């Protein structure tokens, strides 16, 4: 029985790897656009929708993964102390949120304009902490998810003069950032993922038939990538920028100038 609850569902890791490739593809386009000013990414064009489709897939998988981890912990725990289980989720959420804060710091230092204040890692960290009490429900998560999405779309048309509600989805008039995934509407996507996880993987069991492709060499490598999506997310942009610079597709002299100023500042 324990072996059953320790196994992974290869399709989740595979889909996460697909989302990673979509993310990398978009960021290649975005980096070229940013450094060359080609205007490739603009509101409501193909790449704008592509980025949101990528985020939707990522966050849906976050919700599904939360239900899987919850089911696994519940069935493997000899003592079902829900308080201790919740503490594990809080710690996990805080770790991911901390990585988001690191990205906030780095983008503030190197970019200034477009600083990432509440990106996808911030959202995932908060979602892991806040979603825990509702992980066992089905329809309720669907209702909450749809409500959050609709409410988020509604409040996106309103602007305020203070920045304290940016995390929620209420922006200031001249707000600009490179990565923005506020609680409303994007937490709603996580809730829908939780709903789907409870439908398709009840009690850590697949409710549908699927061929086992986990031994396929290509699938196996992709699943490995999917299992390490956080590491890929954290390192892929510096790697992409370095590669694009090496092949002469972008000029990052501005970043070198900023880095030099920071170095000289700390030498004083």
What is each residue range found by the language model?
Residues 1-268:
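Alpha-helical transmembrane segments and their immediate juxtamembrane cytosolic regions
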């Amino acid at each position: 029985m324990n072996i059953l609850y320790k196994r992974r569902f290869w399709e989740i890791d595979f889909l996460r790897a697909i989302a990673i490739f979509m993310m990398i593809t978009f960021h290649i386009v975005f980096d070229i656009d940013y450094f060359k000013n080609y205007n490739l990414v603009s509101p409501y064009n193909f790449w704008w929708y592509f980025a949101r489709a990528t985020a939707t897939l990522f966050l849906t998988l976050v919700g599904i993964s939360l239900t899987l981890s919850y089911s696994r912990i519940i069935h493997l725990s000899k003592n079902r102390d829900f308080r201790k289980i919740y503490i594990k989720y809080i710690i996990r959420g805080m770790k991911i949120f901390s990585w988001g804060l690191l990205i906030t710091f780095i983008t503030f230092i190197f970019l200034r304009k477009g600083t990432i204040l509440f990106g996808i890692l911030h959202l995932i960290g908060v979602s892991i902490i806040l979603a825990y009490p509702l992980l066992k429900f089905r329809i309720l998560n669907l209702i909450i998810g749809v409500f959050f999405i609709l409410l988020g779309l509604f409040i996106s048309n309103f602007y305020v003069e203070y920045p304290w509600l940016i995390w929620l989805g209420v922006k200031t008039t001249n707000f600009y950032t490179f990565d923005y995934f506020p609680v409303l509407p994007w937490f709603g996507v996580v809730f829908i993922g939780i709903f789907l996880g409870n439908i398709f993987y009840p009690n850590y069991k697949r409710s549908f038939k699927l061929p086992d492709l986990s031994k396929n060499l290509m699938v196996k490598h992709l699943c490995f990538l999917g299992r390490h999506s956080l590491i890929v997310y954290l390192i892929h942009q510096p790697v992409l920028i370095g590669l694009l610079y090496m092949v002469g597709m972008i000029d990052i002299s501005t970043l070198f100038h900023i880095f030099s100023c920071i170095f000289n500042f700390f030498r004083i």
